[in-house]
């Protein structure tokens, strides 16, 4: 059996995998164990009571975190005319149409978010094989296809997170960084859960939010007592 590292021993001593911690204690514990030499991302996994094999139970959406993600977001926008001008005014990192599509097909893909105005989807649609596998394909459900291009760019720059249930019915999202205080992380988590509740499929029966786990990039998952979040 492989020998445990000092960090692994510390985590094993501090985290009881069979215990669900009050949310504030869970967040404090995750921050305490985030000891890497960089500000680790604080992430949440939310297990939903849905059947992701059914198309009407796929949960997909976006949330503007009130305290952001702590990450500087690179945003590309497909738009023209006034929408292109508005995107540039909001700080988009790249704005264009066919020219931007050609650059992306050539490998220029170092963006966190790709946004498109509805009239640009004819151009963007051809990029499905390039953007789709990277989770960058614009979609109305996540607010990345929008007539309000300026607002979409503003939200992305402010720390909007996008998510979709995986094959196990779990949503994964960042809620901040290890250098955030617990209150900021809590506010971000509350905002995410509020939006997830709004997205509950009408065909989903029983308990909707079944489990919540928070973790840092290099740390262990810490289960959260749902009752302390009111869900």
From Swiss-Prot:
Gene3D superfamilies in UniProt: 3.30.190.20, 3.40.50.790
Name this polypeptide is given: Large ribosomal subunit protein uL1
Assembly notes: Part of the 50S ribosomal subunit.
CDD domains: Ribosomal_L1 (cd00403)
This protein's GO CC annotations: cytosolic large ribosomal subunit
Primary role: Binds directly to 23S rRNA. The L1 stalk is quite mobile in the ribosome, and is involved in E site tRNA release.
The keyword Ribonucleoprotein appears for this protein: yes
A family per Pfam: Ribosomal_L1
Gene source species: Halorhodospira halophila (strain DSM 244 / SL1) (Ectothiorhodospira halophila (strain DSM 244 / SL1))
């Amino acid at each position: 059996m492989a020998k445990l590292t000092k960090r692994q021993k510390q985590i094993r001593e501090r985290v009881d995998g069979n215990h669900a911690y009050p949310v504030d204690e869970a967040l404090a514990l995750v921050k305490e164990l985030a000891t890497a030499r960089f500000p680790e991302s604080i992430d949440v996994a939310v297990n939903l009571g849905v059947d992701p094999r059914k198309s009407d139970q796929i949960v997909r959406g976006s949330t503007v975190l009130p305290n952001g993600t702590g990450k500087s977001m690179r945003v590309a926008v497909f738009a023209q005319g006034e929408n292109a001008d508005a995107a540039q005014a909001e700080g988009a990192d790249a704005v264009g149409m066919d020219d931007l599509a050609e650059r992306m097909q050539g490998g220029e893909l170092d963006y966190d978010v790709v946004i498109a105005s509805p009239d640009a989807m004819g151009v963007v649609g051809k990029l499905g094989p390039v953007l789709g596998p990277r989770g960058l394909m614009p979609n109305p459900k996540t607010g990345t296809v929008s007539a309000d291009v300026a607002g979409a760019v503003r939200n992305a720059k402010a720390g909007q997170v996008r998510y979709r249930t995986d094959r196990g019915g779990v949503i994964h999202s960042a809620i901040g960084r290890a250098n955030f205080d617990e209150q900021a992380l809590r506010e971000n988590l509350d905002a995410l859960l509020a939006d997830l509740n709004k997205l509950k499929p009408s065909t989903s029966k029983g308990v909707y939010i079944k489990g919540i786990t928070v973790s840092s990039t290099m740390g262990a998952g810490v289960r959260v007592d749902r009752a302390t979040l009111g869900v």
